[in-house]
């Protein structure tokens, strides 16, 4: 495309330079990684979302995250994961390359808007089922999301749900003692907090925290900082047995074992009947199933925590079970060897430019 195929428009505090096919640009949100607007695609005749990555080459961390996000969005195709519709830059050469624009499906709201709204069991379990289907699809490619939270789960009025934002995803065959700050604190699994190695069911803890928030209407474990988050986990759910602490590094183990021991609250106290929908006789059984699923997701020791496959087979969500959704053909396994390399920033810029330019070629 030539420069005449693009136009510029200020959206909030950001200038978008987009293809002329996209009109009616309206600001809908922003974050550390980008600014998002809604628009109308005159070619496909549908409303879409356009995300402009903010300064993707300002440092190696931002560049790696942008590279991961683009590669993952290009390879993943599932109804419960946000779909990539277009990828472009107005730059004509690598020297001019500064901005990346990602065109995605447009949803109505993120899950933050849903929390606090009274939902019946059917809607709640259907949202949960879709979230688990999306996670299962990622896990089938060996991808752990690592950053699940209400703000990066989006929904439509018809109750359809999609996961977005993959910048923190990592393959499951790499067991890392990774930074405790990869996940928004409230949804961070215990094994992340204490620096243990972790695998796929780290995402299931996050789902449990989100599910709990949908039911209760408030954050289950609102830690003020890194240490307080661990303390909240043990105060609410109980101090884990000594076998758990044997897996920790000596310094972390020393701290954890020096803290008061807590019995924790019962699941019935944490999730009493009156926080669940209980309008019909059938609701009572669904409430029991919902509480049971929470108890299996929110296990401090990941060895005791339910897997995504087990969660999908649980009575609370299995009423929606569709093999075509649960066992959708997995993408090829994602190779993180590229984005784990430490290379000069200009080489990251080249890689990202190539990802953008090869999208429509």
From Swiss-Prot:
A motif (TXY) lies at residues 179-181. It comes from the Eukaryota. GO terms for biological process: JNK cascade. The modification Phosphothreonine is found at residue 179. Dually phosphorylated on Thr-179 and Tyr-181, which activates the enzyme. The modification Phosphotyrosine is found at residue 181. Coiled coil: none annotated. InterPro entries: Kinase-like_dom_sf, MAP_kinase, MAP_kinase_CS, MAPK_JNK, Prot_kinase_dom, Ser/Thr_kinase_AS. GO terms for molecular function: ATP binding; MAP kinase activity; protein serine kinase activity. The active site is at 147 (proton acceptor). It is an enzyme of class 2 (transferase). Its cofactor is Mg(2+). It catalyses: L-seryl-[protein] + ATP = O-phospho-L-seryl-[protein] + ADP + H(+); L-threonyl-[protein] + ATP = O-phospho-L-threonyl-[protein] + ADP + H(+). It holds the Pfam family Pkinase. ATP binds at residues 29-34, 51. Activated by threonine and tyrosine phosphorylation. Residues 22-317 form the Protein kinase domain. Keywords: ATP-binding, Kinase, Nucleotide-binding, Phosphoprotein, Serine/threonine-protein kinase, Transferase. Its EC number is 2.7.11.24. The TXY motif contains the threonine and tyrosine residues whose phosphorylation activates the MAP kinases. Responds to activation by environmental stress and pro-inflammatory cytokines by phosphorylating a number of transcription factors, and thus regulates transcriptional activity. Belongs to the protein kinase superfamily. CMGC Ser/Thr protein kinase family. MAP kinase subfamily. This is Stress-activated protein kinase JNK. It comes from Suberites domuncula (Sponge).
């Amino acid at each position: 495309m030539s420069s005449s195929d693009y136009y510029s428009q200020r959206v909030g505090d950001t200038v978008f330079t987009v293809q002329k096919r996209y009109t009616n640009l309206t600001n809908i949100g922003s974050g550390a990684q980008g600014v998002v607007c809604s628009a109308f695609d005159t070619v496909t005749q549908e409303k879409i979302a356009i995300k402009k990555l903010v300064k993707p080459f300002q440092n190696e961390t931002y560049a790696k995250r942008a590279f991961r996000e683009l590669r993952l969005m290009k390879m993943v195709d599932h109804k419960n994961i946000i779909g990539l519709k277009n990828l472009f830059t107005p730059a004509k050469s690598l020297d001019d390359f500064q901005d990346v624009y990602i065109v995605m499906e447009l949803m109505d709201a993120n899950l933050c808007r849903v929390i606090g709204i009274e939902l019946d069991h059917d809607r709640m379990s259907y949202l949960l089922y879709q979230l688990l289907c999306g996670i299962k699809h990622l896990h089938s490619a060996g991808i752990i999301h690592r950053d699940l939270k209400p703000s990066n789960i989006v929904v439509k009025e018809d109750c359809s749900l999609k996961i977005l934002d993959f910048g923190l995803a990592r393959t499951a065959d790499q067991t890392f003692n990774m930074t405790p700050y990869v996940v928004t604190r409230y949804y961070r699994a215990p094994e992340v907090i204490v620096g243990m190695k972790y695998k796929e069911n780290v995402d299931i803890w996050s789902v449990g925290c989100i599910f709990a928030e949908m039911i209760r209407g408030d954050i289950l474990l609102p830690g003020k900082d890194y240490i307080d988050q661990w303390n909240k986990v043990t105060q609410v759910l109980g101090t884990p047995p000594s076998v758990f602490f044997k897996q920790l590094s000596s310094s972390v183990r020393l701290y954890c074992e020096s803290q008061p021991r807590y019995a924790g609250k019962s699941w019935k106290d944490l999730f009493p009947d009156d926080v669940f929908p209980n309008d019909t006789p059938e609701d009572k059984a669904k409430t029991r199933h919902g509480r049971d699923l929470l108890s299996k997701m929110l296990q401090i020791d990941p060895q005791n925590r339910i897997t995504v496959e087990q969660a999908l087979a649980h009575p609370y969500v299995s009423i929606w079970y569709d093999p075509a959704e649960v066992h959708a053909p997995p993408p090829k396994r994602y190779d993180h060897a590229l984005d784990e390399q430490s290379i000069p920033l200009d080489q990251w810029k080249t890689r990202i430019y190539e990802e953008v330019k090869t999208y429509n070629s």
